[in-house]
């Protein structure tokens, strides 16, 4: 009985793995998606960062970071200098990690002929970029919801897009390719979409499960079912191993909670409640967590080449405020264990990377020292038969490195310098590390 139960548990909860997880998903309307969109977004992000962060001190000022992080022991190795250098390099090499062509809120409701046309044109553009290697590492589309009023339009767009994409790529779907389902309310919606994806794969002769699912948790019914049960596990189970990510739709969710528009916010307690339900439902499974958007855009109100000092100062203030709001929201997500989020505008990308790098780099030295000390003390204690009661803390430190490496903020060398081997890190278990070292000693 126990063996069967334990095996079932381990299969469902294999643990957090060291595997690449995007730090963001960038999405934009399907009508705007053209050949070279990823490169265009990258250049816009680089230009924005170069304009408003001329060096690490200016970046720190714009973000409102502590002065201690700017100076450090050696200004060339200060936290902000390291963050600045990594952000600049990241924007030049891979500014967009994950991209979604949007047929929902970022696109709107249009005439059928118009949406049909955009489904074709966006799919052709994606096919061309796929063949030239210009796509983001991860890509996909967001369809409309499968609610009664949009279900037919949603599946029609999906069919047109996938069919056109397959036609122009000789049957080679970009991998990973995610289909994002918004405003989920019932497992039946996920089940129907899963069956439809299977039919598309069979129709076009592409490998089974080439089309993955991403579920948006943005209704109260996606959190709690009509029978009062937590609904997220049932939604994932209905996806038949296709579901790879669950995304919090912050503003739709808070709206569904009947919260007034001027109080809807990334950090609203209702949003944190949803995050925690997602976390306890999915952490340790094969489904990763992704947070929602920041709706304050870093867009300068004054344009042109001959701006007055007042206009330039106004631009800087608006941009700095947007940076700080976005940075604060991302740091909030990271502290809660959400290492990925959605971005709306290329000007938000530098701040995404700055927040992720800052989060891990500011904690690196302390985590390294504590992990090394914990492992050493645990090994010694186990040799004399004493009980080691700080396993939870040790596991948290291991998780820090696992998550930092998975999102690209830390390197495997950072972990090696903390005294942990790559094999031990891939085991993801602090207790196993201690046990194995105790045996070897």
Regions found by a protein language model. Name each.
Residues 1-441:
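Expand to "…catalyze enediolate/carbanion chemistry for C-C bond making/breaking, isomerization
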């Amino acid at each position: 009985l126990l063996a069967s139960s334990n095996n079932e548990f381990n299969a469902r909860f294999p643990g957090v793995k060291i595997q690449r997880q995007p730090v963001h998903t960038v999405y934009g309307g399907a009508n705007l998606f053209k050949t070279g969109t990823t490169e265009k977004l990258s250049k816009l992000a680089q230009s924005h960062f170069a304009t408003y962060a001329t060096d690490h001190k200016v970046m720190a000022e714009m973000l409102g970071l502590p002065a201690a992080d700017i100076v450090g022991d050696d200004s060339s190795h200060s936290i902000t200098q390291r963050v600045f250098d990594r952000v600049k390099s990241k924007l030049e090499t891979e500014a967009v990690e994950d991209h979604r062509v949007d047929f929902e809120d970022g696109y709107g409701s249009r005439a059928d002929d118009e949406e049909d046309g955009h489904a074709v044109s966006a799919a052709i553009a994606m096919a061309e970029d796929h063949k030239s290697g210009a796509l983001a590492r991860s890509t996909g589309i967001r369809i409309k919801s499968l609610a009664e009023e949009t279900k037919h339009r949603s599946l029609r767009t999906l069919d047109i897009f996938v069919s056109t994409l397959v036609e122009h790529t000789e049957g080679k779907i970009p991998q990973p390719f995610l289909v994002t389902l918004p405003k989920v309310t019932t497992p039946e919606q996920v089940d129907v979409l899963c069956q439809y994806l299977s039919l598309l794969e069979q129709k076009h002769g592409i490998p089974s499960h080439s089309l993955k699912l991403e579920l948006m948790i943005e209704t109260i019914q996606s959190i709690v079912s009509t029978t009062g049960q937590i609904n997220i596990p049932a939604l994932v189970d209905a996806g038949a191993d296709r579901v790879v990510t669950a995304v919090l739709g912050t503003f739709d969710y808070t709206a569904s909670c009947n919260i007034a528009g001027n109080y809807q916010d990334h950090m609203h307690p209702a949003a944190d409640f949803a995050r925690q339900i997602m976390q306890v439902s999915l952490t340790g499974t094969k489904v990763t967590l992704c947070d929602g958007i920041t709706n304050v855009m870093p867009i300068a109100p004054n344009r042109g080449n001959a701006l007055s000092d007042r206009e330039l100062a106004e631009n800087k203030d608006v941009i700095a405020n947007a940076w700080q709001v976005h940075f604060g929201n991302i740091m909030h997500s990271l502290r809660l264990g959400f290492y990925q989020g959605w971005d709306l505008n290329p000007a938000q990308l530098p701040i995404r990377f700055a927040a992720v790098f800052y989060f891990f780099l500011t904690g690196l030295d302390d985590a390294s020292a504590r992990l090394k000390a914990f492992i050493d003390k645990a090994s010694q204690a186990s040799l004399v038969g004493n009980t080691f009661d700080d396993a939870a803390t040790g596991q948290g430190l291991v998780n820090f490195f696992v998550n930092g490496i998975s999102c690209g903020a830390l390197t495997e060398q950072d972990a090696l310098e903390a005294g942990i081997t790559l094999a031990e890190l891939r085991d993801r278990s602090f207790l196993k590390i201690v046990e194995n070292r105790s045996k070897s000693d």
